[in-house]
Amino acid sequence: FSADMQTPKHEQSMTTDKVIDIDSLHLRYYGDNFLRHSDSGLWELFVKGDAFQRGEAIGKLSSDLLHYQEKVFVDQIREIVPSDSYLKFLRFFIVLFNRNLGENVLEEYRDEIYGISLSCTHEYDFIGTPYERQLNYHSAHDLGHAMQDYMLVGCSSFATWGTQSADSSLLIGRNFDFYVGDAFAENKQVAFYVPEQGYRFASVGWPGMIGVLSGMNETGLTVTINAAKSAVPTGSATPIS
């Protein structure tokens, strides 16, 4: 049994651009895009172009980070569910649950995820193709609702303004409680996007995550995703992030 993830048909760009790694500055370049490991310990990503171009650049710049994030994610799932037979059942359940996921994800997002997947490892192809895995990982937050007893999901946030903040300006904070082990949280990333269409925006997450869990666009519009207990879903839909 397999699912239709509506894999995009793009071919890898024939560009002559190569990743330029400047170790002394903890900086990587790929065309007009870059990834930097700042003194704060955060990864700072800057990408521009259409969806596929952005995804391809993300993959080229962070292939090692993508492999690390996937490894620790899969390792954590194996720790939570140590039984191989149950893992096989869980994989079947996810394939069945997400069988229509592709049609619920906009083409722009699928293109970006596909671009990223071209630089992903084949070590976990027993789960699915790199594209299928990356698309499913983007629904993990939603699937966490169906696994509430494992405490995979639960976020908190606050906002204050006026007399309640030091200078009367709006102050927003959040705690992202999507816990998949300490190792998964090691590589925190702030991504700056310059899309061909739409507003520029910044997003806080981890390597490979294209959704906005905490972010702000150039007009000042701010979004944070906060999960709450809800009814168990019966099928796939557009991931909330």
Model-derived regions, located:
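N-terminal mature-domain region immediately after signal-peptide cleavage
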Residues: F1-S241
